[in-house]
């Protein structure tokens, strides 16, 4: 837009046509500095692969921004790289908790573009298969859901701690990446008598059911469902009315030599609110 004396505002014809035609997309400007940072990410400097995977899954990463020396080309630590990404607008900074996260889906797409090539196949496979996993969950296909989560978990062992609850939550957020289109995803959402591990709240005007996920270690997927009901985690959906899918996922840490042994199991139930 540009001011014009006595004529009000003057707009570019191309912009007006895009607005009238509802033609919108992400046109994120890439800078030379970001291209340089991308090399560090792709080379896994300072264990950036695991950290970027966590960011893409929706995690918040703690950093120390005070060490940054305003040097746009020399990086001594992951703190320097993430602090510069904050300055460039690719990450947002939480002053209270001193953490960084990806601010929106537009920037999230840029991080995915950054990792699409060069040894990130397990992460990309999880993202590509995430829509199929989401609909399998909605359709109640328990065995398929358990199988897909097991695959994502095993293929990302090298960049995530396997036997760690936060890691499992990260894996699930990555495995359900496509859900962000229709849902707002919350981890450890307060509701009832505790905190639900992951809650999928439908966005406005989306015709999809809400989803509540509970994770268990060395117990059972039935126990996970029982905990959702006992602690009334559905109360975290206080403004929601409709169908809710309860998903219990258990990780079995015991060893077995059986050929058909699976570490992950899944139970899915449906209720109405």
Regions found by a protein language model. Name each.
Residues 234-241:
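Arginine/glycine-rich "motif VI" loop of SF2 helicases in the C-terminal RecA-like domain
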Residues 1-7, 11:
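Single conserved hydrophobic/aromatic residue that forms the stacking wall/gate
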Residues 246-248:
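Conserved beta-strand scaffold positions in the cores of enzyme catalytic domains, especially
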Residues 16-226, 230, 243, 257-273:
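Extended alpha-helical interface modules used as scaffolds for assembling large macromolecular complexes
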């Amino acid at each position: 837009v540009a001011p014009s004396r006595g004529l009000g505002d003057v707009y570019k014809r191309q912009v007006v046509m895009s607005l009238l035609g509802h033609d919108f997309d992400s046109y994120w400007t890439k800078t030379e500095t970001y291209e340089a940072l991308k090399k560090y990410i792709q080379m896994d400097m300072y264990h950036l692969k695991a950290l970027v995977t966590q960011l893409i899954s929706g995690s918040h990463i703690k950093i120390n921004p005070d060490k940054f020396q305003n040097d746009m080309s020399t990086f001594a630590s992951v703190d320097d790289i993430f602090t510069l990404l904050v300055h460039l607008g690719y990450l947002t900074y939480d002053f209270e908790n001193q953490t960084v996260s990806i601010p929106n889906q537009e920037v999230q797409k840029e991080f995915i573009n950054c990792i699409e090539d060069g040894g990130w196949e397990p992460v990309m496979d999880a993202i590509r298969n995430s829509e199929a996993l989401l609909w399998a969950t909605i359709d109640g296909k328990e065995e398929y859901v358990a199988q897909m989560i097991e695959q994502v978990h095993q293929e990302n062992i090298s960049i995530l701690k396997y036997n760690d609850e936060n890691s499992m939550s990260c894996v699930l957020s990555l495995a359900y990446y496509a859900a962000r289109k229709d849902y707002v995803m919350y981890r450890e959402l307060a509701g009832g008598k505790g905190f639900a591990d992951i809650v999928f709240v439908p966005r406005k005007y989306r015709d999809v059911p809400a989803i509540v996920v509970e994770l268990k270690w060395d117990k059972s997927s039935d126990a996970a469902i029982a905990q959702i009901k006992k602690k009334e985690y559905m109360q975290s959906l206080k403004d929601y009315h409709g169908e809710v899918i309860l998903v219990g996922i258990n990780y079995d840490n015991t060893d077995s030599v059986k050929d058909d042994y699976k570490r992950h199991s899944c139970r899915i139930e449906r209720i109405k609110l």
